[in-house]
Amino acid sequence: MKQGIHPEYKEITVTCSCGNVIKTRSTAGHDINLDVCGNCHPFYTGKQRVVDTGGRVERFNKRFSIPGSKK
């Protein structure tokens, strides 16, 4: 590697809003605050909600269907 052309690689702390603290290294040079992490994200915790769009689809089909044509 060439000397003097690479950014400084510093140790930083990444803090999530849930309180999880992760120590890592980065060229950012400053600590980072996150909104969600792997410990509190709904997909990873199993608390994911499924949004039911069945009513919207039926309303769309009812509104834009051609009268007289039925599949």
Swiss-Prot record:
Cofactor remark from the record: Binds 1 zinc ion per subunit.
Database matches in Pfam families: Ribosomal_L31
Keywords, alphabetical: Metal-binding, Ribonucleoprotein, Ribosomal protein, RNA-binding, rRNA-binding, Zinc
Requisite cofactors: Zn(2+)
SUPFAM superfamilies the record matches: L28p-like (SSF143800)
Family: Belongs to the bacterial ribosomal protein bL31 family. Type A subfamily.
Subunit structure: Part of the 50S ribosomal subunit.
NCBIfam families xref list: L31, PRK00019.1, PRK00528.1
Name of the protein in question: Large ribosomal subunit protein bL31
Originating organism: Mannheimia succiniciproducens (strain KCTC 0769BP / MBEL55E)
Organismal lineage: Bacteria, Pseudomonadati, Pseudomonadota, Gammaproteobacteria, Pasteurellales
Primary gene name: rpmE
